[in-house]
Swiss-Prot record:
GO terms for cellular component: chloroplast thylakoid membrane. This is UPF0603 protein OsI_019212, chloroplastic. Its main location: plastid. It is found in: Plastid, Chloroplast thylakoid membrane. It holds the Pfam family TPM_phosphatase. InterPro entries: TPM_dom. Gene3D superfamilies: 3.10.310.50. Signal peptide: none annotated.
Length: 299
């Protein structure tokens, strides 16, 4: 095997030797041995492991590319870990919040009478308002819708937005004649009431002005949104039914007692303090002098 694959025998002849013409037997033997030589050479090449395979499992630097393979592997692992951590710590997308335009395009509520876009009303308040205005509509044929929004971007105040809602929901005078709209803007702490001619006449300007100036803004300032909506509904329903006005919200006198003393109390305390200090000074001078006088008298 070594004789067949030796470089000296395969590549160059011996020095000083002359090339002789090959005999037919030698040519035949040479031609017959060359295929075997090529087969053995190919077999030996197949047995050598490729350098890529060695570099793939060696990490000690014994073969070329081992250290680089481990470094690349660590870089990919760290990048994947960082990406996973960033995804896990990313805040969840906030749920979509309806806007004033969604309220306009949504149309009037068919059965609830309340569009709580601001999300400040409880289920109890919605149920009480629904029961109150549904009974009012069945008896007086006057419908009142209540709307709460967080803020306004298209209109300057709640009154313009209320008029816009009335025109959008009830385009004709016949449709909006007996309809009322109550709007409460939580961020601006203000409210507005508008409606068709029949609604305004049934409620009266005095109750409308009083409700807008007392119930809605005052209670909204204290973030009592449920009370603001429900008391407004009660006052409007009472006015339409011709009942006595329940009135606006009652205010408690939360006057706090001051910790500061009045002028009279200060003068009185000052006189007492002067008397005490003067007495202590007299005692401090008189007692030692009396003791000294008694001591001298004994001598």
């Amino acid at each position: 095997m070594e004789t067949l694959l030796s470089p000296s025998t395969l590549l160059s002849p011996l020095r000083g030797s002359k090339k002789k013409p090959a005999s037919p037997a030698a040519s035949a033997s040479s031609s017959s041995s060359s295929p075997a030589r090529s087969v053995v050479s190919c077999a030996l090449r197949r047995q050598q492991p490729p350098p890529q395979a060695v570099a793939a499992w060696r990490g000690d630097g014994g073969r070329g590319g081992g250290v680089g393979s481990w470094a690349t592997f660590l870089q990919h692992g760290l990048a994947a870990a960082a990406l996973s951590l960033a995804i896990s710590m990313a805040p969840a997308p906030a749920p979509a919040v309806a806007s004033e335009f969604d309220v306009l395009n949504g149309g009037p509520p068919e059965d609830t009478y309340v569009v709580d876009d601001a999300g400040v009303l409880s289920r109890v308040t919605k149920s009480d308002v629904k029961r109150l205005v549904r009974d009012l509509e069945s008896r007086k044929n006057i419908r009142i819708n209540f709307i709460t929004v967080r803020k306004l971007t298209s209109k300057a105040d709640a009154f313009e937005y209320a008029d816009q809602v009335l025109e959008k929901w009830y385009p004709t005078v016949e449709e909006g004649n007996n309809k009322g709209i109550v709007v409460l803007v939580t961020s601006q702490k203000e409210g507005a009431i508008t409606g068709g001619p029949a609604f305004v006449q049934a409620v009266g300007d005095e109750i409308l002005d009083s409700t807008v100036s007392e119930n809605l803004p005052v209670l909204a300032t204290d973030e009592k949104y449920n009370e603001a909506i429900y008391t407004t509904a009660k006052r409007l329903a009472a006015a339409i039914d011709g009942l006595p006005d329940p009135g606006g919200p009652t205010f408690k006198d939360n006057k706090r007692e001051s910790n500061f003393k009045t002028k009279e109390e200060t003068e009185e305390k000052r006189g007492q303090f002067t008397l005490v200090v003067g007495g202590l000074l007299v005692i401090a001078f008189v007692v030692p002098m009396a003791q000294y006088y008694a001591y001298i008298s004994k001598k």
